[in-house]
Amino acid sequence: MPEKLRIGSRSELPAEGEAREFEIGERVVCVARLHGEYSALDNVCPHRGGPLGQGVIEGDKLVCPWHGWQFDPKTGAVGHAPDQCISTYPLTIEDEDVFVEIA
């Protein structure tokens, strides 16, 4: 059963076209904002373990800062390697608090 965890406050969320890392215990989650919507996904690139929350948004893709792998921030799909999809997590905002649901 998924656990709803607070990752921060609304004021800490990334600006449009940016990504940011959030620590939840020993786990780090990437939150990206694209077209006014926030997406939460695994922070680790499956290629070499790059920190996706330190990446940039180019067009509609989140780009890993280490080797340029590109991810759809909503689905976690990798453009050139669909078998390397990363996990995404439901994100909700309640008043000023931001939560993700992690199984």
Regions found by a protein language model. Name each.
Residues 45, 64-67:
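Short cysteine clusters
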Residues 82:
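Glycine/small-residue-rich loop that forms an oxyanion/phosphate-binding "nest" at active or ligand-binding sites
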Residues 1-59, 72-73, 77, 85-103:
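N-terminal pre-ligand scaffold of iron-sulfur
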